[in-house]
Amino acid sequence: MSFDLATCRQSALQLLSRRDHSEYELYQKLALKGHPAEVIDEVVKYVLELGYLSDARYAASQARQIVHKGYGEQRLRQQLKEKRVAEEVIEQALAEQTIDWFELAKEVAHKKFKSGISHERSQYAKQVRYLQYRGFNFEQIRYALQASESDE
């Protein structure tokens, strides 16, 4: 085992001991530390075999964090795609979530817009954009804003 392989393994294990990473993310971080691509490939394969690296576990962890922070399904999909997680893994992580995205959108809208839903066109558009940015789709946004309006 060469010095490069040992240091790369140690770097990978240190990174994975702090939090889960996607394969792509781990690869990128090891490359930034200056490790050669062949060594990184071998180390990624090694940690995959040991079960220390799992895109499915990473996606599930990210899903929990996203929901806890009040972001929507589209935001979760976008973040996981940026980390190059496979589409079927993303679908599996979403299926494991027992969250009602409509109710989450309603909670986020209620928390953000304490003064209520605006009937002024520009303010209403601003509220819609905020919920879009948070990763909710139009049906969820419509439900959240109508539900918040009826709660007043």
Swiss-Prot record:
It comes from the Bacteria. It is found in: Cytoplasm. GO terms for biological process: regulation of DNA repair. One of its GO terms (cellular component) is cytoplasm. InterPro entries: RecX_HTH_1st, RecX_HTH_2nd, RecX_HTH_3rd, Regulatory_RecX, WH-like_DNA-bd_sf. Keywords: Cytoplasm. Modulates RecA activity. Belongs to the RecX family. This is Regulatory protein RecX.
